[in-house]
Swiss-Prot record:
Reported function: Counteracts the host Pycsar antiviral defense system. Phosphodiesterase that enables metal-dependent hydrolysis of host cyclic nucleotide Pycsar defense signals such as cCMP and cUMP.
Catalysed conversion reaction: 3',5'-cyclic CMP + H2O = CMP + H(+); 3',5'-cyclic UMP + H2O = UMP + H(+)
Family: Belongs to the anti-Pycsar protein Apyc1 family.
GO molecular-function terms, A-Z: 3'-tRNA processing endoribonuclease activity; metal ion binding
GO terms, biological process: symbiont-mediated suppression of host innate immune response
Record note on quaternary structure: Homodimer.
Species this chain originates from: Bacillus phage vB_BsuM-Goe3
Cofactor(s) listed: Zn(2+)
Region (Beta-lactamase-like): 21-233
Gene3D superfamilies for the chain: Ribonuclease Z/Hydroxyacylglutathione hydrolase-like
Name of the protein in its database record: Anti-Pycsar protein Apyc1
Residues reported in the UniProt entry to bind Zn(2+) 2: H64, H66, H154
Length: 259
């Protein structure tokens, strides 16, 4: 049993970033379970550059089905099947996304086999996570680990979720994944969690919270709460904005944080 929960940003980049890997976090819980939050197309390379082998990964949690969050799943599935002898890891998926993840995204490259058509559970141990359209829904994974999912608005008619990570009964971190600016969700996250990792686009307008919106929000909250916010999912021009985020900080790709 480890003393602390650890989080490392595998990638911090926006969907179109060429300097940074797709936004993704590697979390090690105190029981040693290694969880990857989202697996975009460049994330397997990001894990490799961290020196973290796929053999050490225990599970992947998916927050929504955009390619910069699921595009690397096919590589992981095929690597586990053909290189690691059919090893299965957990695939933790919000319940409404289980069917579309396979039917609309993954089956085009993964359903083919010499003997029969394959399904998602031929590659992963699929674990469905509870969701709620009116608030939070918690799923206990084992005696140590639980996840709370929060419905977010990212793109119209697309299901997307933020996730709260709980280790040994303690709320550890709120991870927005992708969402437009949501003052009420931020209020809740800052009240309930010691750390908040929030997506941040560096221009106003679009399908993510903008830096201007987040700065406007933080002007009205205590500095202690501002210090809890790490910004992620940013563009390649992030250097232009260093020192212009108030008390908030840009999450650094590859840096380990003790939660």
């Amino acid at each position: 049993m480890l003393d602390t929960t650890k989080l490392t940003m595998v990638g911090t980049g926006s969907a179109f970033s060429k300097k940074f890997y797709n936004n993704s976090a590697l979390v090690t819980f105190t029981n040693g379970y290694n969880l990857l939050i989202d697996c975009g197309h460049s994330v397997p390379k990001g894990l490799h550059d961290l020196g973290f082998p796929l053999e050490s990964l225990d599970g992947i949690l998916i927050t929504h089905t955009h390619a910069d969050h699921i595009g690397g799943l096919e590589e992981v599935a095929l690597y586990n099947k053909f290189v690691l002898g059919g090893r299965k890891i957990d695939l933790l998926v919000p319940e409404p996304l289980v069917e579309p993840l396979w039917n609309d995204s993954l089956n085009g490259g993964l359903r083919y086999d010499d003997s029969r058509e394959l399904e998602l559970d031929d590659y992963f141990t699929v674990r469905s996570l509870k969701t709620s359209d009116c608030g939070a829904a918690r799923t206990q994974i084992d005696e140590n680990i639980a996840f709370t999912l929060y419905t977010t608005l990212h793109v119209s008619h697309m299901k997307s979720y933020a996730v709260g990570l709980i280790d040994r009964g303690e709320e550890k971190v709120f991870y927005s994944s992708d969402t437009v600016f949501d003052e009420y969700l931020l209020d809740y996250a800052l009240t309930m969690f010691p750390w908040v990792f929030h997506d941040c686009q560096l221009f106003t307008g679009g399908v993510h919270a903008s830096l201007d919106e987040l700065l406007g929000y933080t002007r009205y909250i205590p500095e202690k709460q501002q210090n809890k916010i790490f910004l992620m999912h940013y563009g390649d021009n992030v250097e232009e904005f260093i020192g212009k985020t108030g008390r908030m900080r840009f999450a650094e790709q590859g840096r380990e944080i003790i939660l």
